[in-house]
Amino acid sequence: MVEIGMGRTARRTYELEDVTIVPSRRTRSSKDVSTAWQLDAYRFEIPVIAHPTDALVSPEFAIEMGRLGGLGVLNGEGLIGRHADVEEKIAQVVEVAAKEPEPSAAIRLLQQLHAAPLDPDLLGAAVARIREAGVTTAVRVSPQNAQALTPTLVAAGIDLLVIQGTIISAERVASDGEPLNLKTFISELDVPVVAGGVLDHRTALHLMRTGAAGVIVGYGSTSGVTTSDEVLGISVPMATAIADAAAARREYLDETGGRYVHVLADGDIHSSGDLAKAIACGADAVVLGTPLATSAEALGNGWFWPAAAAHPSLPRGALLQVALGERPSLEQVLTGPSDDPFGSLNLVGGLRRSMAKAGYCDLKEFQKVGLTVGS
């Protein structure tokens, strides 16, 4: 703790960029490294989840993510469930963002498009397309709309439900309606639930006690895209937040006699090195936004924005162009080959090589690797 003034202290925290992996074991071949992990009954070959935003995940994108061994999460409150011509609507948003120098012009259009009511049939059809492809089907809803939307999604055949907001707690209190008690809500569902985001040990532990299969750390913070720091004064020191959630996971594992809750890191991961450091800090998998938005399959055509950018009264995100010209395939972004020396392509290959150099052969073991912090 540090004193920031008389009678007021604050905790010193660390970002992923502050942390460095320290290899200290016998090196091994990257071919002998496994990046597989399992969330409840669902096995994935790579520890990568696509951030649930219309700029990224369409049914086709989610299917390709599944084919490549990852998980694409559809935004259940996005434009896909509101407009039949969603690709045309997103093209309009991108056009405004590219032409208008004022960033609020594209935000206003996003807000207008999100003002259209959700159509359960459209949303159900999108879920059905993913399910019919034979990949794991996951949809994100906000805490305030979880109770209303979940029955439709379960009926459509989702495998995983993601309850995600900027910040989430085990119980959401509302003066204008019934509070959402996650423990009760999750216990009544037949599908596993992933919940987040959380920033600290206590909230992570509380969410684990609700019965969630996974806990998301962070809210997808990305420089130039997310503006929760500017709007709310809230930001996430990801290295510290991941390590705190991992400590909560160990505590809950002891408390329950063996129930393992997965920690998913969402924010400030831009390269394969960041991905490796997130796992090293204790994450089981990462949630990626801008790195995947550079792919040809991404719905935003080289642009990225978070779901919070469309909030009707307090947007907390901006539109950012992340790719120009010809874009790489999603397969190249995830598994290569790469011609980029800075780690933006072959993300999983970079992770595998980092694990091999450090002498570890699976993700859970790699969470024990040595770390240092720069001055």
Swiss-Prot record:
Alphabetized GO MF terms: IMP dehydrogenase activity
Cross-link annotation Isoglutamyl lysine isopeptide (Lys-Gln) (interchain with Q-Cter in protein Pup), location: K99
Source domain of life: Bacteria
Any single GO BP term: GTP biosynthetic process
Family annotation (Pfam families): IMPDH
CDD domains per the UniProt record, alphabetical: IMPDH
Signal peptide: none
Top-level EC class as recorded in UniProt: oxidoreductase
Membrane keyword on record: no
EC annotation from Swiss-Prot or TrEMBL: 1.-.-.-
Keywords noted in UniProt: Isopeptide bond, NAD, Oxidoreductase, Ubl conjugation
Family: Belongs to the IMPDH/GMPR family.
Protein name stated in the entry: Uncharacterized oxidoreductase MSMEG_1603/MSMEI_1564
Organism in which the protein naturally occurs: Mycolicibacterium smegmatis (strain ATCC 700084 / mc(2)155)
Species classification: Bacteria, Bacillati, Actinomycetota, Actinomycetes, Mycobacteriales
